[in-house]
């Protein structure tokens, strides 16, 4: 019987993701194609490892008042209880009530791209989200408060040295709610999360 090692398994997964992001960066000259390939790596990771109740897609988010977000590279949403509003040729529109997290995916991170990601996150958090009372055999549960939507950025590299140092912290703190980035991953260097 062989000895399993969880640290080795997870390290191998990280190496695979980092390698695939590096391949996307080095193989394609066209920025749009390079970006699409990088998004596909992140989407594949989430689609493989999230519980099946959740789904990750590139999409627009819409609210009950008909307002739309910007296009979001990676939207994590509840597929079990929320149907798509619209899905045509890969262009998806997802109801705001079903969104758990949104991420901008980039080849690299710098102050301008952090600001860009913050604006994308803000475009989702600005949407109206509704909730209805839930009837049950013994009466009615009151409507639930909408849960906070996580916002983040996913990238291969960073323009800063150190990648996750003070320059990044300053860029992250330049934008308050609703564009706040809660977490992110720079595959070649590590991850960050907002301290509560």
Regions found by a protein language model. Give the residues of each.
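Intrinsically disordered, low-complexity Ser/Thr/Pro/Gly-rich regulatory segments
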Residues: 1-71, 76-196
């Amino acid at each position: 019987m062989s000895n399993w090692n969880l640290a080795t398994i997870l390290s191998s997964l990280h190496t695979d993701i980092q390698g695939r992001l590096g391949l996307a960066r080095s193989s394609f000259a066209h920025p749009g194609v390079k970006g699409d390939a990088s998004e596909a790596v992140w989407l594949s990771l989430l689609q493989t490892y999230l519980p099946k109740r959740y789904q990750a897609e590139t999409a627009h988010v819409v609210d009950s008042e008909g307002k739309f977000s910007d296009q979001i590279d990676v939207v994590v949403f509840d597929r079990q209880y929320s149907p798509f509003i619209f899905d045509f040729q890969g262009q998806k529109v997802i109801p705001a009530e079903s969104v758990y997290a949104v991420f901008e995916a980039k080849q690299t991170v710098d102050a301008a791209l952090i600001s860009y990601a913050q604006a994308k996150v803000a475009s989702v958090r600005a949407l109206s989200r509704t909730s209805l009372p839930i009837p049950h055999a013994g009466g009615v549960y009151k409507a639930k408060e909408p849960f906070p939507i996580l916002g983040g950025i996913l990238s291969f590299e960073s323009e800063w040295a150190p990648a996750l140092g003070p320059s990044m912290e300053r860029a992250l703190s330049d934008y308050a709610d609703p564009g706040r980035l809660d977490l992110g991953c720079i595959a070649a260097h590590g991850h960050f999360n907002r301290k509560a």
